Amino acid sequence: MSLFSSITVEEFNRERTVQLADDHFELQRPGRNHEWIVRNVLPIGYERYCAVSLPWEAASDGESHLFFGFREAYHFFKRPVPDPLTLSRWHGDFKFVEANREIPPALKGILSRSAESADLVLVRCCRSSDPMDCYYWTTERALFFELTDPFWEMPHRFGHFDIFPRGAAWYMAHRDDEPLLYLAGTARLLDSIHTALPDQALPLRLDDRFF
């Protein structure tokens, strides 16, 4: 039995009380060679944005090495850490694959507390650019944050995901081929994330690249 219950697109959109940019992919379909940026995917109107790394692997001399943070890999390979370190720079400096999608416990705690008045978390999974290939679910907020890897428990595990609690206190986006969670929220929330995960969170602006 699935831990996620199906809902309609109308029910999902009714709860998604957010503002989308004019060039958000739902309002303006990007061309094939479009370089995606944060506002193409995440809602605008939140105070701050960031990317949080999930476990990822980089190869060197035929061996694969597991990392959790961004700077950690520079130190391991004895490379200077860029200043400033940006998501685009990290993405260009390493060839990597996603190791797993276990959400850091500290992040789960912060997100759960910031939405403690919400009873549900809502999820959209789009497996392709076809709107008919999008699926919508809800699950209990407390249950969602008990799961080590909530994506593994979803009816469809792969695709592009939009996730938010009822009331949209924060907003999360994730692609299954990138070891990243993109987050939008209040300044206080993002400050808490950067404090708890100093090497796993990088600040973003709306016009930064979305990978």
Regions found by a protein language model. Name each.
Residues 1-211:
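Acidic, proline/glycine-rich low-complexity IDRs
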